[in-house]
Regions:
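N-terminal alpha-helical targeting/anchoring segments
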Residues: 1-140, 154, 158
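TRNA-recognition modules of translation machinery and tRNA-sensing kinases, especially anticodon-binding
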Residues: 27, 135-434
């Protein structure tokens, strides 16, 4: 959500930003917001004037009542003024109701206006216009065929999607044996990796209130992702970023405690409605998965430096497991409405001979802070909005696809990189059972 002051002072900037995001249908929202804001400010001003006048009249009544002890004729004037006060009270009640209604309407409109993107963001309508920035590691071209990832897992008796389908439907899985252990090893390694980077490890709530959902994401994203608990003001999180940023809702953060750097583990639950949907055969796009996440709450002037650090952490993590990756800059049309700048880290798939997304790093500026009413108290006592950022550390089982394909050997075994061996009981290799 953008600053109303910015919209008042530079509506053309907001309109141009909407065009850059190829959301021309939202252009009328600018005028609608300005009209609602003007009407609300007018109601506030009139109400303030009435309160001032009412206070003056009340004071006058007190003075006249004192005078009426000696001059009873003053009581007639008192009654006349009381009638004015009553009339003004009725009008004030109307104005206060208007203020409430106008503020609510304005808030809903402002939630729909996208955040101002960074000038460095490439302009394009959708993810087809995303720009490759840099590659890390040489893409592998094996001299033997790479099976589909579920076939690799099945060779270790490591997955049962048929049973999961009977129990829960499409988009669920059972991981077992060495594959389940590998899944947990990756999460444990990612946790320790981020702790070594100075982040505080946290296990957050896996369900959040509706006002937190509204604070961290757009309505369209919520509809496509979130599961609501029937009869409760609770939603299952789609990523622990939601509850981690939500931790600061309605809070005043002392500036000296910034940056807040947290890394969190959680299960994640997603409807996956939209263009992609659920993958029928595999575990790339599913309803339930586990993830290690990182978030940063920082001073506005530090957010771009943190953005650079955070996506590079992802690269370092994947390269430590011998997985080639690349950074892909997200174009304007591919950015969610709250994002200022974002990039994907994509892992190399030897089977498909192409990259696929495994991490997403985003700078959201002060959008989430404004929605959640997060504030920082500076050294001078003044309040300001912090910036928030988030990035995937690792999200198995999707990450396992990249891991298994890049570490698969011609005999069907999978090598375990040195960094994961302590988490796998010292194993250096997984041997297929089939």
């Amino acid at each position: 959500m953008i600053d109303m002051k910015l919209l008042r002072e530079n509506p053309d900037l907001v309109r141009e930003n909407i065009r850059k995001k190829f959301q021309d249908a939202k252009l009328p929202l600018v005028d609608e917001a300005l009209e609602l804001d003007a009407a609300n400010r007018k109601a506030i001003a009139e109400a303030s004037e009435l309160r001032t006048n009412r206070n003056a009249l009340s004071k006058k009544i007190g003075q006249l009542m004192g005078q009426a002890k000696k001059d009873p004729s003053k009581l007639e004037e008192v009654e006349a003024i009381k009638a004015q006060v009553t009339a003004q009270a009725d009008r004030l009640a109307e104005l206060e109701q208007q203020e409430t209604e106008l503020a609510e309407k304005l808030h809903k409109v402002m939630l729909l206006i996208p955040n101002i993107i960074d000038p460095s963001v490439p302009i394009g309508p959708d993810d087809s216009a995303n720009v490759e920035v840099e590659r890390f590691g040489e893409p592998k071209v094996p001299d033997f065929p790479i099976p589909y990832h579920t076939e690799i897992m099945e060779s270790f008796d490591g997955i049962d999607m048929d049973a999961a389908g009977r129990v829960s439907g499409n988009g669920f899985y059972y991981l077992m044996g060495d594959i389940a252990r590998l899944h947990e090893a990756v999460l444990a390694y990612a946790r320790d990796f981020m702790i070594d980077k100075g982040f505080i490890f946290c296990i957050p709530p896996f369900m959040i209130h509706g006002n937190v959902v509204e604070g961290v994401m757009s309505q369209s994203d919520m509809d496509a992702m979130m599961y609501k608990i029937e009869g409760e003001d609770l939603y299952l999180i789609g990523t622990s970023e939601h509850s981690m940023i939500g931790k600061f809702i309605d809070q005043i953060i002392p500036e000296e405690t910034l940056p807040q750097t947290l890394t969190s583990y959680s299960p994640c639950f997603r409807k996956e409605k939209g263009a992609h949907g659920i993958e029928e055969r595999g575990v790339y796009r599913i309803h339930q998965f586990e993830k290690q996440e990182m978030i940063v709450v920082c001073k506005p002037e530090d957010s771009m430096a943190w953005y650079e650090k955070m996506w590079r952490f992802s690269v370092e993590l994947f390269r430590s497991m011998d997985i080639p990756v690349r950074q892909l800059e997200c174009c304007s049309g591919d950015l969610a409405d709250l994002k200022v700048k974002s990039c994907d880290i994509e892992a190399w798939s030897p089977r498909q001979q192409k990259y696929f997304e495994v991490c997403s790093c985003s700078n959201l500026g002060d959008a989430q802070a404004r929605r959640l009413k997060m504030r920082v108290r500076g050294a001078d006592g003044k309040m300001y909005l912090p910036h928030t950022l988030n990035n995937t550390v690792v999200a198995p089982p999707r990450m396992l696809i990249a891991f298994l394909e890049n570490n698969l050997q011609a005999d069907g075994s999978v090598t375990i990189p040195a960094v994961l061996q302590p988490y796998m009981g010292g194993k250096t290799r997984l041997e297929p059972k089939k």
